[in-house]
Amino acid sequence: MRKFCVYGKGGIGKSTTVSNIAAALAEDGKKVLVVGCDPKADTTRNLVGRKIPTVLDVFRKKGAENMKLEDIVFEGFGGVYCVESGGPEPGVGCAGRGVITAVDMLNRLGAFEELKPDVVIYDILGDVVCGGFAMPLQKHLADDVYIVTTCDPMAIYAANNICKGIKRYASRGKIALGGIIYNGRSVIDAPEIVKDFAKKIGTQVIGKIPMSNIITRAEIYKKTVIEYAPDSEIANTFREIAKAIYENENRVIPNPLSEEELDEITEKIDVLLKESVKG
């Protein structure tokens, strides 16, 4: 069983990436389980075609002793099993707690033994790698971590923070960084910036997602690109990324950048932004 986490700054395209990778793997005959660990609970929306009840919602309504696997696991496109951890009510509690509760409940209900997935994907918010959101790293629930980023300074800053978390917990177990997934949906499209960042922390850019209005159109209809436009170039891009991740053996403990090194990257981005304005 392959298990990996996808981290990244909020709004960076994690859920789009995860849902399309899951759809591509399912299309290839893999049995896939996706666990959405973002309080927005929208990771699996395009797989199922709607938002599903979250583990925390069901937990609050039924209580742990009355919960069943079918209350929290829903089947989506290609037979992908979908779970959403959910989050607390606004202004109350810790969002990361949903991750802990979801994973505990999946284990308690024997989800992994009953579903027997070939691949488990955790989609995790990465703006702040707090205790809850870092749980998959702490508990070694996954083998590999992939980080989605654009070339925006704050996205790279968040990616660097995630690398600090990976390095902290890698010494205690098997968790490692599998690579960076570059998303081209930014003010400027500068893959060389992200390639340079990846090289400096000691990893690879395992996939590049170009800007595509097909992604937006698919999401309007609550579908993955794999389902909505299976013959499109962007669908093939997601298939290539899914294959690269599934077959990847290039796992490293990253070397996070210093503040000075991050500033150097930010200065390069600033130059590119000024050039784009002149152009």
UniProtKB/Swiss-Prot annotation:
Catalysed transformations (reactions): N2 + 8 reduced [2Fe-2S]-[ferredoxin] + 16 ATP + 16 H2O = H2 + 8 oxidized [2Fe-2S]-[ferredoxin] + 2 NH4(+) + 16 ADP + 16 phosphate + 6 H(+)
Binding site for ATP: G8, K9, G10, G11, I12, G13, K14, S15
Reported modifications of this chain: The reversible ADP-ribosylation of Arg-97 inactivates the nitrogenase reductase and regulates nitrogenase activity.
GO biological process, one term: nitrogen fixation
PTM annotation (ADP-ribosylarginine): residues: R97
Record has Iron-sulfur as a keyword: yes
InterPro entries: NifH/chlL_CS, NifH/frxC, Nitrogenase_Fe_NifH, P-loop_NTPase
Cofactor note (record): Binds 1 [4Fe-4S] cluster per dimer.
Source taxon at top rank: Archaea
NCBIfam families in UniProt: nifH (TIGR01287), PRK13230.1 (NF009701)
PANTHER family, sorted: LIGHT-INDEPENDENT PROTOCHLOROPHYLLIDE REDUCTASE IRON-SULFUR ATP-BINDING PROTEIN (PTHR42864:SF2)
Protein name as catalogued: Nitrogenase iron protein
